[in-house]
Amino acid sequence: MRLISVTIIVFCLALPGAATAYGQQVGADLTRGQALVTKQCASCHAVGRTGASRHETAPAFRTLSQRYEIEALEEALAEGLSSGHPDMPEFVFEADDVGAIIAYLNSIQDR
C-alpha cells in the first residue's frame, strides 16, 4: 500500500513538468513551422491568420482545411510538394520540418 501511495505522489509531482515540456515542444514546433512557411511560401501565399495571398491563385494557408485534410499534406510535404501551376516550385521538407509545418497549419485554420 505504501509503494502505491509513493508511486502516485511521484507521478503527480512529475506530471506538471511533463506538461510544461510538452507545451514547450509544441510552441517550438509552431514557431519553426511558421518560420519555414514564411521563408518558403510567403512570397505567394498568405501564411498567417489574416491577409491576402500575394499571388491571386495561391490559397491562403488559413483556408487549406476547406480543401484538404491538413494531416494528408504530410506525405506531399515529405515527398515533394508540387502542383500543376507553373509558378509553384517543388518543395521537399525533412520529417521534423513536416511535423512543424503541419502543427503550424493546424494552428491557423479558419474553422
Language-model segments: residues:
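N-terminal secretory signal peptides that target proteins for export/translocation
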Residues: 1-3
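Bacterial N-terminal signal peptides
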Residues: 5-17
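Electrostatic cytochrome c docking/interface patches
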Residues: 17-36
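Short, non-ligating residues that shape and space the ligands of small metal-coordination modules
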Residues: 50-51, 70
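Short cysteine/histidine-rich zinc-coordinating motifs and their immediately flanking basic loops
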Residues: 53-58
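Extracytoplasmic electron-transfer domains, predominantly the class I c-type cytochrome c fold
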Residues: 60-106
